[in-house]
C-alpha cells in the first residue's frame, strides 16, 4: 500500500502532461519524404494515390482559350486564371507550399 501511495503523484503528473489531441495534431509543412511518411501514417493499409503533374503542366499550365471579340476584360482573365489554378491544387501545393493537417492528408487515401 505504501508503494502505491508513492507512485500515485507520479501517475497523476503523467496524466496531466499527456498531450491533448488538439496540441498533438498541429498543421505543418510536409515535403518530399516527410510527406510520403505522413501519408503512410495516415492512410495505413488503405494506401494513397498521388498523380504528380507532368513537366509540361508545371511549366505551361493550360489556360482556357478565349475567342477574339466580345471576350472578357483583363480583370476577368485574372479571375479565370485564379479559378483554374485553384482547381489544379494538389497535395504538394496543399501540404508543402502551404501547411496542412493530418485530417487534410486523409483526402488522399484510397
Swiss-Prot record:
Lineage of the species this protein comes from: Eukaryota, Metazoa, Chordata, Craniata, Vertebrata
GO cellular component terms given for this protein: cytosol; extracellular space
PROSITE patterns documented for this protein: INSULIN
Protein's name in the database: Insulin-1
SUPFAM superfamilies the UniProt entry points to: Insulin-like
UniProt propeptide residues: 57-87
Signal peptide bounds: 1-24
Cellular localization per UniProt: Secreted
Gene Ontology molecular functions: hormone activity; insulin receptor binding
